[in-house]
Amino acid sequence: MKITAALLISGAMMLSLCACGGTAEPNPVQPTETPAPITYTKEDGRLKMEETYNSNGLLFSTIIYEYDEKGQLVKQAEFGISDAPTGYKSFEYDAKGQKILMTSFVADTAKDYSEEYRTNYEYDGNGNLTRATSTRDGKIVSVTAYEYKDGLLSNEKNYEGESFVASEYKYEYDAGGKKTRCVRIDNIEGDTSENRYTYTSDGLLLADLSYDADGKVISRTEYSYDDNGNAMKLSVYNAKGALISSTSNEYTYDEYGNIKRCAVTHSDGSKGTTTQYRWEYAKG
């Protein structure tokens, strides 16, 4: 049974879990509103095309993915309204299959492109990413340096330019390799914060506690799941333990166990967005 395509009828995704980290690549400007329906097309198990439509059902943007004979992504071409090219990203790999270069181009005309920035990647002998350096016009824009302990990411430093450490993340793990602590140092704002994580017996995130620089609890976020491991409810509490907000997901599944629908409800009783999925299956 091979999934060849999936269609998201509405754009908001399910409960997102806490992410603690940064990126070395410049962040592109995001639109204030994201068009809702997205169609994904897969071929031979690989994502080939992603089409985004606006609320009126008109094609808003398209991303086409190209791969080499090894199955490595080598190009990500982006198009806007009326299939007008907006830019593309190219990727290069070393003999080990490790991505060593990503170059981003922006479309000047329908046929002409200019380089926007590039990111070089470096690895240690174990294949762990140790450094990502982004440059624009030959000048270093940002660097992210990674350190590992026992094969797990232990430290991440995000530089603005070559030398100024804008932020730093320190990670700790339990015996099973689950992240239990993340300390974030913000050298721009002069602030330090911390997150501590606990998990269910199945390894799913159960609670995320946020602390300030003095070690006082700022907030607590709790998660619950259904039997399939999908997030069912997210509850946020303040420092005094009072419920601030909660969001619940309700799922329905098709005969193959894939999600058909996810309906979101907020703690005030208001309905959030509903995401519907249509899966196409290859015969045989």
For each feature predicted by the language model, list its residue ranges.
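Bacterial signal peptide processing site
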Residues: 21-24
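Positively charged n-region of N-terminal signal peptides that target proteins for export
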Residues: 1-11
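C-terminal motif of bacterial Sec signal peptides marking the signal peptidase cleavage site
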Residues: 16-19
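Buried hydrophobic residues that stabilize the cores of well-folded domains
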Residues: 26-284
